[in-house]
From Swiss-Prot:
Subunit field text: Homodimer.
Pathway where this protein functions: Metabolic intermediate biosynthesis; acetyl-CoA biosynthesis; acetyl-CoA from acetate: step 1/2
Keywords assigned by UniProt, alphabetized: ATP-binding, Cytoplasm, Kinase, Magnesium, Metal-binding, Nucleotide-binding, Transferase
Residues annotated for Mg(2+) binding in this entry: 7, 379
Native source organism of the sequence: Acholeplasma laidlawii (strain PG-8A)
Name of this protein: Acetate kinase
Principal location class: cytoplasm
UniProt cofactor(s): Mg(2+); Mn(2+)
Cofactor note as given: Mg(2+). Can also accept Mn(2+).
Cross-referenced Gene3D superfamilies: 3.30.420.40
Amino acid sequence: MKILSVNAGSSSLKFQLLQMPEEFEIASGLVERIGNKNAEFKIKFNGSSKTQSDLVVLDHSVAVDLVIKGLLENKVIASLDEIQGVGHRVVQGGQLFKESVVIDDDVVIKIASLNDLAPLHNPANIIGINAFRKAISNVIHVAVFDTTFHQTMPEENFLYGTPYEWYTKHGVRKYGFHGTSHQYVSELAHARLGKDHSRIIVAHIGNGASITAVRDGKSIDTSMGLTPLEGFPTGTRSGNVDPAIFQLMQQKEGYSLEKTLNELNKNSGYLGISGVSHDSRDIIAAAEGGNKRAQLALDIQAKRIVDYIASYYVLLGGLDALVFTAGIGENAKEVRKLICDRLGVLGIKLDDNKNNSRGDKEISSDASNVKIWVIPTNEEVMIARDVLRLQNK
């Protein structure tokens, strides 16, 4: 059966059409710059790709129409009847959703009630859900939450040292994100280890990034928190800072709470430290060219990532595998080396020659006590698996 996996962002819409249960990609694509008159639509199928530029795509419903039209006009499908399920990535499930769910009107209302916890993401996810439910109305639609995989964290790992009533009244706690990716990659790593019990750390490093400790297939701690801002510096996010920074910036610069939060979310990390770019490729190139602030941005991130890995090593009582995934984790050998070279005291040792090659591979040296792998993530497959599972229930 054909299942469509959808990831709706605030200004983008990613999709992948999969043949299930074979997990074969039939087509994939992306609509970028939604809300503008210069949007772009890309679709890949049968080994070829097509791009349409300078499109007027004022909202997500137009983007959905583009996707459906692209699938039909390129004869990827003969009719919409071939699509037998749609899976939707939803960033924040809060404490309302402990697992993936079949979407109905009540589920949409509950997802919307969590918008305060993910104001940049959940509203866009809902727009995508509503647009696809209207366009393809006669099939199962499933919400798959970034937070679900982390529901196995114990209280001591997900609660903050804030007044307990904040948690009971407002749900103030660590939720974690990228759960779909962490689950997919850790399941593969567990299978490769061939052990009943495993201790795995997954480093999902992209423009957004997080680290997760996984014991026997279950998340027991993760670096992102109430929102994706917690953790280590990424493309534009600061990661952990002293909350008193909000008062300081109000006193020194007259910044409102919203202004400082925006600076921490959109003008920090690689971009804020280097002054060059949010893109790791630009940062690495600038650092290699002698830009000290670009190198500093890489060093600060690597140091904070190592802090998490070392902490989770202790939490897990040792480590069987360290896995790198996502855009930077899979492709930036320089970032992997910066991290692994700081972990030698834990018996984690990189093979530089293996690290210089691309693709799904082991990059640990023969002397390493821990397996180091690069495993490409595939969140769309995980989403499609849940659609198939719930349809067969």
